[in-house]
């Protein structure tokens, strides 16, 4: 069984890593807060490492899933860093929803040591991760992806080679900007309908049989806004980061993007208002506060 390392046992990282605990791999995990790695290892029969270097030693594939590309880059250096543990010929697969420029810089640094890099952000949420049915969007060269496939297949159902390093991050950011637009526009529309006396269940019943429907209207709003549950599965802080990446990417490509830029401003303000622990769908609460009513 070849060893494989997974670093970053957060809301989505932990259920992804669980799929690597299978007969094909000898899983070793590392997490910034060591108690989480120890608990994960004990519950899943994996080993846990004290440092990124220790986790990476002897592994052909090292997977990271951290908040941003910046945290990934910060794990590379020092005596305990990934570069101290990763061998020539090994691969870093970064499942963070990262930014293309930092991923390219990280790939270049790794290439100097003969180490491959793939940006491989995922979509499908915590539910998709638990079910092993994530979509994985990969940037990097095809031969490197081929070698990483056995690992990606454990938690991914649809694995798409998107282009060179940074392409996976770019597609993920554009997808996230669309998710953010859907949340905000449906929140505004539903609040107006609610104020006009239309029941939210009735509004969603119509919208979900019509051309405005989306994952937000079909799943997120019925489960979270109507039920006022707002489970914390994907942080508002992270979608704020994603929309910023999209806004930056569109500016770099010289695409006039007023909608994406405004969405980035709205989510940055919502993040500032609701704090670090709020879930992304809770952005609707800002619309409700400024609109002076609740969607009900
Ligand atoms: P969480 O905030 O739940 O977890 C973040 C993880 O990163 C934790 O393991 C945390 O360690 C670690 N971490 C944070 N800062 C540092 C640091 N400076 N150095 C080392 N480790 C650090 O995030 P998620 O798991 O939700 O998200 C991870 C990535 O996946 C993000 O890029 C996100 O956008 C993306 N994603 C998330 C989805 C979701 O549904 N949650 C869906 C699709 C993509 P510690 O335990 O010590 O805090």
Name each region found by the language model.
Residues 1-64, 90, 95-96, 126:
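NAD(P)+-binding Rossmann beta1-loop-alpha1 motif at the extreme N-terminus of oxidoreductases
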Residues 4, 66, 97-177:
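Rossmann-fold dinucleotide-binding core
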Residues 52-116:
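Rossmann-fold NAD(P) dinucleotide-binding segment
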Residues 131-132, 136-139, 160, 164-196, ...:
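Active-site-proximal catalytic alpha-helix in oxidoreductases
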Residues 178, 214-280:
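Interdomain hinge/lid region at the active-site interface
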Residues 272-296:
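NAD(P)-dependent dehydrogenase/reductase Rossmann-like domain
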């Amino acid at each position: 069984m070849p060893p494989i390392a997974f670093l970053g046992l957060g809301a989505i990282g932990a259920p992804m890593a669980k799929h690597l605990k299978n007969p094909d791999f000898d899983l070793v995990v590392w997490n910034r807060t060591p108690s989480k790695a120890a608990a994960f290892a004990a519950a899943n029969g994996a080993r846990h490492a004290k440092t990124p270097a220790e986790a990476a030693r002897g592994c052909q594939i090292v997977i990271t899933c951290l908040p941003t590309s910046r945290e990934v880059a910060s794990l590379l250096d020092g005596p305990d860093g990934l570069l101290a543990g990763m061998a020539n010929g090994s691969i870093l697969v970064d499942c963070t929803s990262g930014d293309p420029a930092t991923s390219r810089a990280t790939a270049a640094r790794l290439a100097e040591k003969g180490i491959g890099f793939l940006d491989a952000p995922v979509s499908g949420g915590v539910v998709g991760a638990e079910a092993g049915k994530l979509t994985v969007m990969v940037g990097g060269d095809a031969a490197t992806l081929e070698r990483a496939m056995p690992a990606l297949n454990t938690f991914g159902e649809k694995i798409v080679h998107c282009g060179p390093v940074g392409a996976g991050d770019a597609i993920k950011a554009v997808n996230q900007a669309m998710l953010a637009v859907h949340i905000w526009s449906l929140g505004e529309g539903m609040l107006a309908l609610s104020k006009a006396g239309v029941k939210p269940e009735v509004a969603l019943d119509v919208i979900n049989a019509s051309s405005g429907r989306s994952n937000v209207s079909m799943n997120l709003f019925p489960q979270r806004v109507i039920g006022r549950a707002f489970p914390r599965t994907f942080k508002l802080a992270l979608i704020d980061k994603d929309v910023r990446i999209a806004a930056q990417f569109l500016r770099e490509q010289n695409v006039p993007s007023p909608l994406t830029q405004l969405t980035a401003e709205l989510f940055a303000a919502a993040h500032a208002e609701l704090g670090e622990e709020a879930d992304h769908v809770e952005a609707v609460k800002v619309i409700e506060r400024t609109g002076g009513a609740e969607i009900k």
